[in-house]
Amino acid sequence: MKTAIAERIEDKLYQNRYLVDAGRPHITVRPHRSPSLNLLALTRVCPAKCYELNETGQVEVTADGCMECGTCRVLCEANGDVEWSYPRGGFGVLFKFG
């Protein structure tokens, strides 16, 4: 009989390495008075938890742990809430297992 092993996403993410390009984030959130529904959704659906709602009700991004999966582009590209570009060569996520 095999024993099921529960794996957490946090354990997998911990294996990745990130080379941060200090002062040049590849993701920025457009200034807003109140966040759109898509920006609010990013606080829940970003797999790396890069988006947070701050104390003033604004959505902020911390791009340091970004997996470059494109979830934010899919949700916010149409309305322009997020500006996303690829990190410069050699920077960004370095996947441990491919």
Curated annotation (Swiss-Prot):
Residues 57-87 form the 4Fe-4S ferredoxin-type domain. Coiled coil: none annotated. The keyword Transferase does not apply. Keywords: Electron transport, Iron, Iron-sulfur, Metal-binding, Nitrogen fixation, Plasmid, Transport. One of its GO terms (biological process) is nitrogen fixation. It comes from the Bacteria. The keyword Transport applies. Pfam families: Fer4_ETF_QO (PF05187). GO terms for molecular function: iron ion binding; iron-sulfur cluster binding. InterPro entries: 4Fe4S_Fe-S-bd (IPR017896), 4Fe4S_Fe_S_CS (IPR017900), ETF-QO/FixX_C (IPR007859), Fd_FixX (IPR012206). To ferredoxins from P.putida and C.tartarivorum, ferredoxin I from A.vinelandii, ferredoxin II from D.desulfuricans. Could be a 3Fe-4S cluster-containing protein. This is Ferredoxin-like protein. It comes from Rhizobium meliloti (strain 1021).
